[in-house]
Amino acid sequence: MKNKFAALVITLFVLVLAIDNVTTQCLEGCECNQESTGKTCRPKQGSNVSPAVCLAQYCYHGYC
């Protein structure tokens, strides 16, 4: 019984992480770089945000 409960908790934890990754949006002043393989963010034109800050974020098509 303990093994089933542990497996359920781990599965739910992984599911929450997966959902969080899929719905990540770029920070304010950044936009999704659709040309990048990993769908990283980049600064919007005219934004003062540094590229390093935007690159630290990932986004997915449909959420950017």
UniProtKB/Swiss-Prot annotation:
<keyword id="KW-0732">Signal</keyword>
<keyword id="KW-0964">Secreted</keyword>
<protein>
    <recommendedName>
        <fullName>Putative neurotoxin 5</fullName>
    </recommendedName>
</protein>
<keyword id="KW-0800">Toxin</keyword>
<dbReference type="GO" id="GO:0090729">
    <property type="term" value="F:toxin activity"/>
</dbReference>
<feature type="signal peptide">
    <location>
        <begin position="1"/>
        <end position="18"/>
    </location>
</feature>
<comment type="similarity">
    <text>Belongs to the scolopendra neurotoxin 6 family.</text>
</comment>
<dbReference type="GO" id="GO:0005576">
    <property type="term" value="C:extracellular region"/>
</dbReference>
<keyword id="KW-1015">Disulfide bond</keyword>
<keyword id="KW-0528">Neurotoxin</keyword>
